């Protein structure tokens, strides 16, 4: 069994938390494309990664999503990286920063971002450097603070309780850094 197919390590195995954010052209990998990916170490957001990708030919382009991320389809088709190249770069960066530690994917509504990253890693490379290790900040907030409903875990609600200096801009690296700051607050602030 190769390292990327192994389950997360046992208790005591070193872990490295990596904040990841994506911008997409649709709601799922089967109906849209991964357009941009930003990542940084939670404990050192200056160690970061960012790539823009070419859309999958024929994949949907949701105008509502485009208004949010403000990426231009024609520019991405011309200047974005081929998905296999971008995912090779991402996996290489994750492998470099994690060393012998288990890489843990951290996101705000991690299931959305993780499904695109996992799909693209498997589809274009045949491996996912995160395995199934993901930490969702919304769920962490809900459990840590005893929040009684998922609806009360939106970015505005969490930011009101745990303000951070970084802004949510819908640029993947900016948002990964904002999530890293929020993760540090959720993990290290006293209760």
Feature names for model-found ranges:
Residues 104-111, 115-116, 120-121, 154-191:
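Acidic, Mg2+-coordinating catalytic module of metal-dependent nucleases/exonucleases
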Residues 2-114, 160-162:
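Conserved non-catalytic scaffold segment of RNase H-like nuclease domains
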Residues 54-69, 73-76, 137-180:
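Active-site-proximal helix-loop-helix substrate-binding element of RNase H-like nuclease domains
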Residues 1-7, 150-155:
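Short, motif-level signal for alpha-helix interfacial/capping segments enriched in acidic residues
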Residues 32-35, 119-123:
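Short, glycine/charged-enriched secondary-structure capping and boundary segments
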Residues 121-131:
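A short alpha->loop->secondary-structure connector
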Residues 134:
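Short aromatic/basic micro-patch
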Residues 30, 117-118, 145:
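Short, well-ordered secondary-structure micro-motifs
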């Amino acid at each position: 069994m190769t390292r990327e197919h192994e389950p997360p390590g046992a208790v005591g195995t070193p872990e490295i938390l990596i904040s990841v954010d994506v911008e997409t052209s649709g709601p799922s990998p089967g109906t849209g494309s991964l357009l941009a990916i930003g990542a940084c170490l939670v404990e050192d957001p200056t160690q970061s990664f960012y790539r823009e990708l070419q859309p999958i030919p024929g994949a949907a382009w949701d105008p509502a999503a485009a208004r949010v991320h403000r990426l231009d389809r024609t520019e991405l088709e011309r200047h974005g990286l081929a998905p296999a190249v971008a995912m090779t770069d991402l996996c290489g960066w994750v492998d470099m920063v994690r060393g012998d530690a288990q890489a843990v994917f951290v996101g705000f509504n991690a299931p959305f971002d993780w499904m695109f990253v996992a799909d693209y890693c498997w589809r274009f490379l045949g491996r996912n450097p995160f395995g199934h290790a993901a930490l969702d900040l919304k769920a962490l907030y809900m459990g840590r603070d005893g929040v009684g409903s998922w609806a009360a875990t939106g970015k505005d609600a969490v930011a009101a309780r745990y303000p951070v200096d970084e802004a949510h801009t819908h640029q993947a690296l900016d948002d990964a850094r904002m999530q890293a700051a929020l993760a540090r607050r959720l993990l290290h602030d006293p209760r």
